[in-house]
From Swiss-Prot:
Segments traversing the membrane: 100-122, 150-167, 178-198, 232-254, 274-294
Identification of the protein by name: Sideroflexin-1.1
KW Secreted (keyword) present: no
Disulfide bonds: none
Family note: Belongs to the sideroflexin family.
Reaction equations catalysed: L-serine(in) = L-serine(out); L-alanine(in) = L-alanine(out); L-cysteine(in) = L-cysteine(out)
Length: 329
């Protein structure tokens, strides 16, 4: 009975994550929860029930039988299913919980179809198309990233990845070992370096929104926008590095074993399934662990901002000494 929400001296604050976001461990726990692919299998009834619980709780309507654990479970499913700004149900392939299975499939294709021109073109087109769905689904409700900008970013990232993949393939065409297998990672790293800055070019030019402790807008900073874009790009590349580097290394070792070499059917049919499985195991850990590298809501002292931004903030009544910004994912 003590676990009932109505019996709590201090009610749980579901406007913030359950775990302390000031520590890496707390952020990792939060992202392990929010990227859990099992939430994709929840029914429409379960999703609507969780939405009702969360919506009612925010307005002060609390069921007398609702437990703290049930509240947090409802919040987890609600956050993974509904857009945080619009409240609309997100397309299931674009949800963060679809990152592991979605990237698992695309990685298997990237690592298994790297030898031929059609394979390279199709796998990188498929991968960037999946990324575009994720970016579009998770765009901010107040985002100024237009459909045109999303499309241009998608085209540039896709063409960049294909160009690098085909160029490096030509350089290592006489190599059938590890060097050729690592080409997809180099292509993906460049695609992220193109896609993310282009997607957020509006923030880079106009500045990232800065808010005080009361969530009131107090200014915009190009410096923090550049830092945030760099952090997100780094975390995306770091997310891909373990499974896109280790998977080829493991597969390269497997192909050299006598067991593999003496079984032609394995050489013909098993490479993509094996690499997909290995990548999936890696993705289960790298997705939340790399999303947690940097705090999503970060703070900065006003005196460390650009001089023009400092003047703007200090001209306000009771100006804050510390401001906050959302770096994004």
């Amino acid at each position: 009975m003590n676990n009932l929400v109505v019996n709590q001296t201090v009610l749980p604050d579901i406007s913030k994550p359950k775990w302390d976001q000031g520590t890496y461990a707390g952020r990792a726990k939060h992202f392990f929860s929010s990227t859990n692919p099992l939430t994709l299998f929840s029914s429409r009834i379960q999703q609507e029930k969780c939405k009702e619980i969360v919506t009612n709780y925010k307005t002060g309507v609390i069921s007398p039988t609702l437990t703290v654990d049930e509240l947090w479970k409802a919040k987890t499913l609600y956050d993974s299913t509904y857009h945080p700004d619009t409240g609309e149900k997100m397309f299931f392939l674009g949800r963060m919980s679809a990152q592991m299975p979605g990237n698992m499939v695309t990685t298997g294709m990237l690592l298994g179809l790297y030898r031929t021109l059609p394979g390279v073109v199709f796998s990188h087109w498929f991968n960037q198309s999946f990324n575009a769905v994720v970016n579009y689904t998770n765009r901010s409700g107040n985002s100024k990233a237009t459909n045109e900008r999303l499309f241009v970013s998608y085209c540039c990232a896709t063409s960049g990845a294909m160009t690098v993949a085909l160029g490096l393939n030509k350089m290592v065409k006489n190599s059938h070992g590890l060097a050729a297998r690592l080409v997809p990672f180099a292509a993906i790293a460049l695609a992220n370096a193109i896609n993310i800055p282009m997607m957020r070019s509006n923030e880079a030019s106009e500045g990232m929104e800065l808010k005080d402790e009361n969530d009131q807008l107090v200014g915009k900073s190009q410096k923090m926008a550049a830092l945030s874009i760099a952090q997100v790009t780094l975390s995306r590349i770091a997310m891909a590095m373990p499974y896109m580097v280790m998977t080829p290394i493991i597969m390269n070792r497997i192909t050299r074993t006598a067991y593999y070499r003496t079984r032609p059917w394995m050489q013909k049919y098993s490479e993509i399934p094996i690499q997909t499985l290995i990548a999936g195991i890696g993705l289960y850990f790298t997705t939340p662990l790399c999303c947690a590298l940097f705090p999503q809501k970060s703070s900065v002292e006003v005196e460390k901002l650009e001089s023009s931004v400092q003047k703007e903030i200090m001209s306000r009544p009771n100006p804050p000494k510390i401001v906050y910004y959302n770096k994004g994912l």
